[in-house]
């Protein structure tokens, strides 16, 4: 009987924790470029549909880090998941670099409701 209570409590905790998960991911189309060549960078956020998402305010012409510039910003793309319970919002950027080096691209930050989440970091070789 005691084992059954612990099992039920464990299942409740697992399902409660799974509901609040937010996943933030950033990917580069190419990790290596020539000077002036362009590549895509995509930021994707998966979260519960009833939550409010605020993406980073990155504009065309802005530098992510010195010498790595955003040359184009696409409109966000939204995918509905799990019969409307979750969603993924993806934002695509086109970037270029103006000098040869290894560039550390720091994590991108998003806000979901009142919590801040960060993506993975990347390294770009030019």
Pin down the residues of each PLM region.
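Bacterial Sec-dependent N-terminal signal peptides
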Residues: 1-27, 41-42
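Surface-exposed interaction/ligand-binding surfaces
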Residues: 20-126
């Amino acid at each position: 009987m005691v084992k059954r209570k612990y099992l039920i409590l464990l299942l409740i905790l697992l399902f409660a924790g799974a509901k609040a998960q937010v996943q933030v991911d950033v990917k580069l189309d190419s990790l290596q470029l020539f000077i002036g060549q362009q590549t895509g960078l995509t930021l994707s956020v998966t979260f519960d549909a009833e939550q409010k998402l605020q993406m980073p305010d990155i504009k065309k012409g802005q530098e992510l880090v010195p010498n790595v510039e955003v040359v184009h910003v696409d409109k966000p793309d939204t995918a509905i998941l799990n019969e409307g319970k979750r969603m993924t919002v993806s934002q695509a950027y086109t970037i270029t670099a103006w000098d040869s080096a290894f560039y550390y691209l720091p994590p991108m930050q998003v806000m979901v409701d009142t919590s801040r989440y960060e993506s993975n970091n990347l390294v770009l070789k030019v």
